[in-house]
Amino acid sequence: LDTFTVAAVETITENAKDIGITAKNITDALAIATHANVTISGTLPATSTADIASIAAILATNGKVTANVAAGKAADLITAIAGAGAADALTLTLTDVTVAATDLISLNSKTSVAINANSVKTINGTVADLTKVYVTNKSSFTALGNEDVSITHVIPATPISASDVNSIAKATTGKVTAAVASGTAKDLLAALKDTNGKDDLTITIGDTVADAKDLLALAGKTSKPLVITSVTDVNGTVA
């Protein structure tokens, strides 16, 4: 008589279409092999209440879950895979055109697989959150780097430092929208080296005396007129 121990079961596999209502076929197996990994072939739907209940049941395992989740909006996917963790290998594809950086960060914490963000055309977020998306976790997303970015404020009406704006502009070829903290023309010009005329930046010059060439160069860094109310004298040559 051959015997086996439940501890020997390392992975439970099933096709997405055969998992049963609320993933009963998976949960029944997990009731026996409680620490097994779960691998689902096919694509798990994630739209209805029943779909979400099935995914939640699968993610309740103590092991790693490997699965492809149907494409969807970031907010919906966050709800659908709430029980997932960074060790799970969930393939996620976004359908959003506009998405919050916080949602991207949240999804990234739920999977070890790079998230497909090809549909995204605009990202909104604070500098801290955008930095997590574009710098800290850059490899966690695919197809990012050509979308527009709107930098929001931690405190309303508080401008963003020029260096922070530039770090985001450097990460995308899209348009960057932000209110830049006031500074001297020379300092702003040096800090905003990766911005250009497509960017929608509110740039406020803090000088009372400025060089014409610096003002002209800064004007080429934004699609908006410069705010130069503090400037009383401009030095330069007649062109």
Model-derived features with residue positions:
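General marker for long, soluble alpha-helical cores
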Residues: 1-239
